[in-house]
Amino acid sequence: VTAEPAPIFGVFVPQGWKLEFAGVPDPREQWRLAVDVAVRAETLGFDSIWVYDHFHNVPKPSHESVFECWTTMAAISQRTTTIRLGQMVGCNLYRPPALLAKITSTLDVISGGRLDWGIGAGWYENECRGYGYPFPVPKERIAMLQEAVEIVLSMWSQPETT
């Protein structure tokens, strides 16, 4: 009889996307709260922490803080040692694939190999428009996602990518 795999538990780190910091006016205090959740999750034995790849709040933009996911994970990686780090889920429309390959590989190195990379085609049109990113039709976004995954995987594993 083989044992069932143990459940894996993760927790979201507050970063403002869902207005988790409403009522906390100081961004430095908001950051301390985010880091405290990550450190506490590791101390409690969670397997992973997760952040959203968004730039402003939902359901519509507000003036509340939202911490950018890659910067957030890089900083938290230096305050933790074992917990895995992931995005739920990275948006392909926000960063060119070659840059994304560099960001992800850098974070994986500085975190000691703890990155769990997730990427999607993008869905939040208001956010894309608000930051000046094109928002193609779904078929085109899916094709762009496929190409991006191929580029990132090649840049991670091949001596040269063309």
Regions from the PLM with identified roles:
Residues Y52, M88, G118-G120:
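Structural motif
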Residues V1-R79:
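N-terminal beta1-alpha1-beta2 module of alpha/beta enzyme domains
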Residues P7-E29, N92-T162:
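Flexible, glycine-rich active-site loops centered on histidine and acidic residues
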Residues S62-Q87, M144-M155:
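Alpha-helix-loop-beta-strand connector modules within alpha/beta enzyme cores
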Residues T43, T82, V109-G112:
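Alpha-helix termination/capping residues and helix-transition junctions
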Residues I49, L85, L115-W117:
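Hydrophobic residues within beta-strands of alpha/beta enzymes
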Residues D47, T82-I83, T161:
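A general structural signal for well-ordered secondary-structure junctions
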